[in-house]
């Protein structure tokens, strides 16, 4: 899980979602998991 000030989709399988008021990227590639914060 990378924590970044701005999250972006890295590949076409990445999805930007909101969870508990946080913007996150989920992907089938675990290296692409990101959270804003």
Swiss-Prot record:
Q: Which residues form a coiled coil?
A: none
Q: Which GO terms describe its biological process?
A: translation
PROSITE patterns xrefs: RIBOSOMAL_L36
What are the protein's UniProt keywords? Ribonucleoprotein, Ribosomal protein
UniProt cross-references to InterPro entries, sorted A to Z:
Ribosomal_bL36, Ribosomal_bL36_sp
**Origin, by domain of life?**
Bacteria
One MF term in the entry's GO annotations: structural constituent of ribosome
How is this protein annotated for GO cellular component? cytoplasm; ribonucleoprotein complex; ribosome
Pfam family example for this protein? Ribosomal_L36
On whether Ribonucleoprotein is a keyword of this UniProt record, the answer is yes
Q: Which NCBIfam families match?
A: rpmJ_bact
Family of this protein: Belongs to the bacterial ribosomal protein bL36 family.
Protein name as catalogued = Large ribosomal subunit protein bL36A
Q: Which organism is it from?
A: Arthrobacter sp. (strain FB24)
- Lineage of origin: Bacteria, Bacillati, Actinomycetota, Actinomycetes, Micrococcales
């Amino acid at each position: 899980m990378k924590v970044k000030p701005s999250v972006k989709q890295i590949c076409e399988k990445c999805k930007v979602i909101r969870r508990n008021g946080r913007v996150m990227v989920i992907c089938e590639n675990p290296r692409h998991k990101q959270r804003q914060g």
